[in-house]
Swiss-Prot record:
It comes from Prochlorococcus marinus (strain MIT 9313). HAMAP family: GcvP. The lineage of its organism: Bacteria, Bacillati, Cyanobacteriota, Cyanophyceae, Synechococcales. It is an enzyme of class 1 (oxidoreductase). InterPro entries: GcvP, GDC-P_C, GDC-P_N, GDC_P, PyrdxlP-dep_Trfase, PyrdxlP-dep_Trfase_major, PyrdxlP-dep_Trfase_small. Its EC number is 1.4.4.2. The glycine cleavage system catalyzes the degradation of glycine. The P protein binds the alpha-amino group of glycine through its pyridoxal phosphate cofactor; CO(2) is released and the remaining methylamine moiety is then transferred to the lipoamide cofactor of the H protein. The keyword Oxidoreductase applies. One of its GO terms (molecular function) is glycine dehydrogenase (decarboxylating) activity. PANTHER family: GLYCINE DEHYDROGENASE (DECARBOXYLATING), MITOCHONDRIAL, GLYCINE DEHYDROGENASE, DECARBOXYLATING. This is Glycine dehydrogenase (decarboxylating).
Amino acid sequence: MRHIGPSLEDQQQMLLELGHRDLQSFVAAVVPPDILETTAPSSSLPEGCGEVQAMEELRLIAAANRVRRSLIGLGYYGTATPALIQRQVLENPAWYTAYTPYQAEISQGRLEALFNFQTLISELTGLPIANASLLDEGTAAAEAMSLSFAICKRPAAHRFLVDAEVLPQTLAVLRTRAEPLGIDLEVAEPMTFQFDAEVFGVLLQLPGRSGRLWDPTTSIQAAHEVGALATVAIDPLAQVLLAPVAEFGADIAVGSVQRFGVPMGFGGPHAAFFATLEIFKRQVPGRLVGQSVDAEGQPALRLALQTREQHIRRDKATSNICTAQVLLAVMASFYAVHHGPDGLAAIARRVLRLRAQLERGLHQLGYPVQSIARFDTIEVICREAPAVHQAAALAGFNLRVLPLGVAPEAAHGFGISFDELSTDQELKSILQILAEAAGQPVPVLEDPGNPHLEELVGLPLRQRPWLQQQVFHRYRSETELLRYLQRLVGRDLSLVHGMIPLGSCTMKLNAAAELIPISWREFAALHPFAPQDQCQGYQRLVQDLEHWFADITGFAGVSLQPNAGSQGELAGLLVIRAWHHSRGEQQRDVCLIPTSAHGTNPATCVMAGLRVVPVACDADGNVDLNDLASKAEAHAPQLAALMVTYPSTHGVFEPQIREICELVHGHGGQVYLDGANLNAQIGFCRPGTYGADVCHINLHKTFCIPHGGGGPGVGPIAVSAHLMPFLPGHPLAACGGEQGIGAISAAPWGSAGILPISWMYLRMMGAEGLRQASAVALLSANYLAHRLHPHYPVLFRGQAGLVAHECILDLRPLKRSAGLEVDDIAKRLMDYGFHAPTVSWPVAGTVMVEPTESESLEELNRFCDAMIAIREETAAIESGQIDPQNNPLRRAPHTLAAVTAEVWDRPYSRAEAAFPLAEQRQSKFWPAVSRIDNAYGDRNLLCSCPSVEELADNAVLKPPLV
């Protein structure tokens, strides 16, 4: 079983060191006996198999998807992923196995790619602050609504005005998110908006769903006059030609860069964006990359303004977004680098020209077409619509069915959206279909030659040069772009270099066989709103995963729609809330949360319209049962739920988990189990059988979807039978429960395009393989704790003195004895070739280590050797052998440039700095920059590449290093 790192012989050696004879007895000592299933539970999972067989089976499933040319639009478009980007980024483990770039000194490659992404978005929108991606356009619009609501200080302001032309999936997500917050959505034509003091924000769509282009300046000014913020949802390809929305007065711009080289993937994953004014920089959701300087005074990139994020602000955060869509944002940024501004403009002009020619053809054929400015889309209401759809289907095209959601044979109209893949031949085929349906000869259109922008007359167009930064012009040849990609990826530490022992993150193997199918056309090229008979492969994939996850977790039903763990949390709490409301218990609005919980939990509670009541933890890191009982009783009439992580965020199996669940149920509440640590449980205990009502599952942790440097993620929820009627639905697809909470993500099945990864993992492992993986994950964590405990105190242990799948090492004594902070240890680990464990969470001054089952005994020992060697270095400080200020830890990490500089004025040798372990002379990963000054970066926030003019005017500004 190649997924599991330690061999059987290595496992036996590890067990002997821990004093256990076999894995079965070891697991029995770790997992509380009242929840332990001593034999593998019956499972719908087939027996595990090899990668060849699994891939052959998945090929048959993929073949059931019939890919047609979809011109449906609605936010999803055909696009050409440059082969170099597909091969060197999407399919490159050095890009997709990295973690969120919290350790910036070893993350400079993807930070630069994200910096380029933010620059692209700022240039498109004209707004100075753009984040490093969001989950999808619907979520981005909802985040804009929440930000506008949070910023508005008028108590009476509760109305959010929405353009009637907004995308239907965006409107659905807005409705789901607005109701718990007490926001009233009003959908209307912008010219009929009724503005007063109750309005806190507006959302406009440009172009609109029907393709309409218009000047929103008047509507934005009207919003500003009553103190409301204006958000504009934009199409980035249209924005290439149009004036930046900042020139219309927009406060916020949102959208998706899917059509910048990211496949449709049946709805995702795609990178959304969020851009705004500088005054709102501390309210921006998600990650924000900023430029700072390192210890040598060189420019360096890092995540900026981190104190505004949910893991810091908790219930005071305006967003619960954690994982975003970094890998897809990176792809889109390289797409822009690949094409440059001229190439992007050429694509946009071609799309505009084809749409204009189609419109002329429609007029000639007698179809009723309204004369308005448009970009890529035309909608037509006509009696010939059923015949048009029938002929289009026979010719291999999917057109938009109007009204949305009806069957083609009942259609009153059709819509056509052109995209990057559209050609003159495609236009001719469409005109032939339309002519046949109308009983007219095919119109002959004159070749307009070089397309002009007369089709957009009357609209403000982009006048000034844009994307003038060198990076968008320098890499015109594939050779140069290939080398640029290689330079960047060489500045990032990922799983291709070594273990990433981040606690609560489960950085396990992402096998090549699991990743290959996501590039298959049958999965990558399918539109999420394609006719159901064309999507049978995806339906089978979804059905398999829903059944398997329900079995694994012990629940009755599953929704795959949430496209991140944060969205799984929100979906789970909203499902609980809807169940209470269905029983007439609207007063239940209290959520109990242990103080050790991840910051996402309290932030999510607030978004779900619940009040957070903290519950204390005892000295052993467990939920304090007395405090829980007291709080549950005090709030019994209002108790909605308890959010609990299991095993706990302190890395132990709490023995009283059944009692905790029963206590909450006894007071009328439901139990939401955060599935971040599910990797410790698979095959041995199931949340649905020991008392939980809802559990979210991180497929990007337990089930092998790679972290992608900060996304994509997938966060399905599994629920008990009584909650199934409330699972998330969608306006354009049959999914969810009869009383579903509404859409939580823009696409019906969320990030469906990466579900084949988890399917392959589950199919290859089988039930017994999953059980073995969890056992080895527990074994590896306890082996590390055993080896490191003589050098660093292990802060919490469960029964029999054992930890779960991770352990917390207490570094606080080093502050007292050697003046060292936990960051000093984290940065020094880079010199040893390791990414640091999770720093200062859940306990400040500690590190949380999670090795996973995929790391070999050799790699586990290499990490232990590094940590022990660092402890010896700290001991030298304690004994006075080395300077307490000027030493390898305080000045870590050490770059190649620093170590090879002509002048070396440090009281330790270059070898001690760069090669603390002898083995590193054979293979060494070098940090790209020295320690970064985070405070400087926040005080001097720079979130996009300076323009040529800015560089000329300000000698202080420097572009990134590469």
